[in-house]
Each structure stands twice: as structure tokens, then as C-alpha cells.
Amino acid sequence: MTKEFHHVTVLLHETIDMLDVKPDGIYVDATLGGAGHSEYLLSKLSEKGHLYAFDQDQNAIDNAQKRLAPYIEKGMVTFIKDNFRHLQARLREAGVQEIDGICYDLGVSSPQLDQRERGFSYKKDAPLDMRMNQDASLTAYEVVNNYDYHDLVRIFFKYGEDKFSKQIARKIEQAREVKPIETTTELAEIIKLVKPAKELKKKGHPAKQIFQAIRIEVNDELGAADESIQQAMDMLALDGRISVITFHSLEDRLTKQLFKEASTVEVPKGLPFIPDDLKPKMELVSRKPILPSAEELEANNRSHSAKLRVARKIHK
């Protein structure tokens, strides 16, 4: 049975308006999720325009088919059930050589967090899962119970930036010697045991960073985003745009770096002009990230950490 997707779209108008949508253009929503961005983008297209929507979660696609039904009936939407790291290959299969714009809403979606059985949330007791693609083999259970101490420390530091990574990895090792760690609640309690009292008093759940680290590892989120954003920039038509929403510093740093590399060039001294093959292919539409408005922050608590970066194709 299809579960309802209750998802408040973050930075909805900013993300799509910054794409400067051409009514007859070809667009991609790389992270379909609750279909809010897709629906708003489609409202700006004529019947000659087309949207390709990616998601590796069948539940998201099932719900989007209902929400976007009027546009589907007009033949304006193609759903692609796959990880967006395969963006270029899947679009080529569909006969698409270039696109006029693409948007990303990175990270886990609100419905995935809210569905207890998906095992993403430290606030709800559930089996350790955290797979965005439920057909994938690697789960949070595998990471927590089978990764050795050094691998746990590596991902906790790298993806969670938690200063207690070593102590938490050691405590996990000790706990699983007694019995496997099977649920989100068990893991959260182990993490709490490690954190000093002053850390537990801080705003935010003490397990947040470790859960983020495990989720990123399970889904290879940063690796997939890196590959996909580079493919997207390659596929953009001249004057095409890319919008990327991030929710934590790792995603934002990655996006900022990819945009910087594509929009700057190191020209050897003494060259009278910049050769075509050295010209930057992108330019930043906004130098600083776009943040949610005060009204959105008040209405949607999950928008607090959101940042939007936008770039435009200026050279093929």
C-alpha cells in the first residue's frame, strides 16, 4: 500500500524562480520527493515543455503520480526511478542531449524521516535501516554492527563531524559484543551514554550528527551528489541553470566547491586572451547562498538549515 507523502517544500519559489524557466524547455527535478518543486516547475511550462523527475524511492514516485496527474495526462512528465548519480546515462537513454535547468533538494526527505519503519529518525523506535533506495543492500544495521572501530571513527568524523567519534565508536564496539544493535532507540541511547552532561544540555539531539553520518554512508550521499551535479552542469544548455538546496555544511561545501571550480579559471600569465577550452563554463547567479525568509522559518522548522545556491551555464 502506498503511504502518503506529507512534505512541506523548502525554498519552493526561490529554487524554481531562479531557474528562469523557459515555457517550452526541458527540465529535471533530480530529487522528486514530495513533488512540490516539480509541481511548481510544471506550472511554468507549456504543454511543449517537459520535466524528468528522478527518485530512487518508489513511494515518492507513487505519490507524485497522484499529485502531478494533470501534467502526466498531458504527457509533460517522465519519472525515472534511479539514483541521480546516473543522471546523464538515464537522460541519454530517454533521448535527452541537453537540459534547460535542473533542481536538487539534497538529503533525506521529510516523509522518509517521518515514516518510522524507514529507520532514519533518532526520535522514533525502528529497525536500523536508513536506505533511501529500499532495494539497496547496505543498511544502517550493517554499518553499526559490522564496520570495525576505525571505519566507524572515519565516517563519524568525516560525515558527522562529531568530536566524540572515537568514544562513540568504542562504545558501539562494546555494546555489540553483548548483542547486535538492532534499533534506532538502542543506538541513540548508546550515543547518549558517551556524551557529557553539558553536551546533552545543548540544543539538538545528541545523536543527530552520528545518525547523519550513518545515513550518508549508507546512501553514499556526497559521492552521488558530486557525480550528479557535475553531470548536470555538463548537460545544461547555454543559459541553462542549476539550483541546489543543501541542509548541512558538508553538502553546502561540496556544492560551493563544484560551482567555484566550474565558474573560475586559472589563466597562465602572459596570455593575451583566454582560449575557449580554458573559459569557465558556469557563472554564479548569486554569490552568497539564498536563505529561507522569516515567514518560511516560522512556518517550517526544517527549513532552518537550508541554503540555496544557483549557477548559470555561460560556455559549452
UniProtKB/Swiss-Prot annotation:
It comes from the Bacteria. It is found in: Cytoplasm. Its EC number is 2.1.1.199. S-adenosyl-L-methionine binds at A35, G36, H37, D55, F84, D105, Q112. The keyword Cytoplasm applies. GO terms for cellular component: cytoplasm. It catalyses: cytidine(1402) in 16S rRNA + S-adenosyl-L-methionine = N(4)-methylcytidine(1402) in 16S rRNA + S-adenosyl-L-homocysteine + H(+). Keywords: Cytoplasm, Methyltransferase, rRNA processing, S-adenosyl-L-methionine, Transferase. InterPro entries: RsmH (IPR002903), SAM-dep_MeTrfase_MraW_recog (IPR023397), SAM-dependent_MTases_sf (IPR029063). Pfam families: Methyltransf_5. The keyword Cytoplasm applies. One of its GO terms (biological process) is rRNA base methylation. GO terms for molecular function: rRNA (cytosine-N4-)-methyltransferase activity. Belongs to the methyltransferase superfamily. RsmH family. HAMAP family: 16SrRNA_methyltr_H. PANTHER family: 12S RRNA N4-METHYLCYTIDINE METHYLTRANSFERASE, S-ADENOSYL-METHYLTRANSFERASE MRAW. Specifically methylates the N4 position of cytidine in position 1402 (C1402) of 16S rRNA. NCBIfam families: 16S rRNA (cytosine(1402)-N(4))-methyltransferase RsmH (TIGR00006). This is Ribosomal RNA small subunit methyltransferase H. The gene is rsmH.
